[in-house]
A protein has these predicted regions:
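Structured core elements
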Residues: 1-3, 32-35, 40-47, 67, ...
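Short beta-alpha junctions and helix-cap segments that line functional grooves
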Residues: 19, 28-31, 44, 278-280, ...
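Core structural elements
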Residues: 36-41, 103-117, 122-128, 185, ...
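Phosphate/diphosphate-binding loops
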Residues: 28-38, 96, 272-286, 291-295
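Active-site core segments that coordinate phosphate-bearing ligands/cofactors
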Residues: 75-86, 109, 144-145, 151, ...
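N-terminal phosphate-binding loop and flanking beta/alpha elements of the actin-like ATPase fold
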Residues: 1-32, 47-102, 106, 162, ...
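Acidic low-complexity intrinsically disordered segments
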Residues: 126-199, 281-425
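Short, well-ordered loop/turn elements at secondary-structure boundaries
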Residues: 26-28, 37, 93, 117, ...
Length: 425
């Protein structure tokens, strides 16, 4: 079972409040969860609506896992210190740079913690060789330097129209993770909120308070998570930038939710979610925003210049809850195994009554084709290209992935997965 960190942070906030969370939110609220950890930045949006006389939380959008976080900040501070040492005539090797990065992390935490009155922290870079102690390099990192590098570099004041920039990349690069090219967290946030402007439009029972002509989805409440945001300076900058966007767009300022646990929220929230899965507590709902279909080729004689017609078979209905599975489709289909094949997926926010097994031969503009998926399914001793009779069953995971299983008559299964989360930054 997987659970996204922002959602886990919100579960922790609910659990820690002992029921008082209802006093901090109201119908029509949109909660923005900003999770800034050591290696990633994540955004989520949760709407507050009324259902049968009670408040209900409904997740309406999830951002990508942006590889940008506290580690980037530590490297940036280490670069500042290295430049100071190089101006003094010192050159650092890779081992010393690694030690410097660790020292910069510790200095950052000291200088930016709540209630800290420290203005500078000494930095010691160990030497290598026989003079390990006497040959160490010494300098300091000041609070002013940390705030300048982190606040202006990672949380710049930008307009809501700002977008992450992408530099021209070299033709060859080392294999590695797809790190964010733009370090501006506020630019990533602006892009996320702009893409989600319609995220609450089809949410039954939600009363939006966004003004006419809004250019991005307006959060009304903020919840922070992650050790980086223990700094009041960084927290204040995010609130400042977001509320400036809201004011310019004609909306009220967002308020900060009280009672967040920035260190242990993910662990505690995950434990509380296990409690929720047993039918207790408060569940954050997150049904699919579309009905989903898979393409099925017609069996027909070959005709020169003519592709076989494709029908769309509904496998997951509109509003299907995450963490649940749909019943198997009644149709028996033939699955091609042992050779490269292509799955075609479609989504529809218009056809809300279709159920698993609904087959569409024509759909005009009601369906939108999603990214195609290529795969070679294991043949398990069968000849390549063999056709296996199967029925399909879909499920939606807790992290918004559509999982499609093809189940043979003897119980053998093949599985493919497609990310069907709402568009995000």
């Amino acid at each position: 079972m997987l659970l996204e960190e922002p959602q886990s942070a919100l579960y922790s906030w609910i659990q820690r409040s002992n029921g008082a969370w209802r006093e901090q939110v109201k119908i029509g609220d949109v909660i923005l969860v900003v999770d800034l950890g050591g290696g990633t930045t994540d955004f989520s949006l949760i709407a507050v609506l009324e259902r049968e006389g009670s408040l209900e939380l409904h997740r309406v959008a999830v951002g990508d896992h942006i590889l940008l976080g506290g580690d980037n900040m530590d490297l940036a501070l280490a670069h500042v210190v290295r430049m100071k040492l190089e101006r003094e005539g010192h050159t650092l090797d890779a081992w010393q740079l690694s030690a410097l990065t660790h020292a910069a992390r510790g200095a950052k935490e000291q200088l930016l913690s709540h209630g800290s009155d420290v203005d500078a922290v000494p930095i010691v870079v160990p030497s290598r060789g026989s003079k390990l102690i006497g040959g160490s390099l010494r300098t300091e990192l000041t609070k002013a330097e940390v705030e300048r590098v982190l606040v202006e570099g990672f949380f710049p004041v930008v307009d809501a129209t700002a977008r992450p920039t992408a530099r021209a990349r070299g033709a060859l690069t080392q294999m590695g993770l797809p790190y964010a090219q733009d370090a501006g967290v506020t630019r990533h946030l602006a892009a996320f909120l702009s893409k989600q402007i319609g995220a609450t439009e089809d949410l039954a029972g939600f009363r939006s308070a966004m003004p006419q002509g809004a250019t991005f989805l307006h959060p009304t409440a903020l919840l922070f998570n992650g050790g980086v945001l223990k700094s009041p300076v960084l927290e204040a900058r995010i609130v400042e930038v977001l509320n400036a966007w809201l004011a310019k767009d004609g909306g009220p300022p967002a308020r900060l939710l009280e009672g967040a646990d920035l260190d242990l929220a993910v662990a505690r929230g995950a434990a509380y979610y296990a409690y929720v899965r047993r039918g207790r507590g408060v569940r954050i709902r997150g049904g699919t925003a579309q009905s989903y279909y898979v393409g099925v080729e017609s069996a027909m004689p070959a005709v020169p210049g003519m592709e076989p017609p494709v029908s769309a078979l509904c496998v997951a209905p509109f509003g299907m809850e995450e963490g649940t599975e749909a019943p198997p489709t009644p149709q028996e289909l033939a699955l091609v195994v042992g050779e490269p094949v292509m799955f075609r997926f479609f989504g529809s926010s218009a056809r809300r009554d279709d159920q698993p097994g609904t087959m569409l031969d024509r759909w005009e503009r009601e369906l939108t084709e999603l990214p195609r998926l290529e795969a070679t399914l294991a043949s398990e001793g069968r000849p390549a290209g063999d056709l296996v009779p199967v029925r399909l069953r879909a499920s939606v995971t807790e992290v918004g992935t559509l999982r499609l299983e093809a189940i043979a008559n003897d119980g053998e299964r093949w599985r493919v997965e497609l990310d069907v989360r709402a568009p995000s930054a």
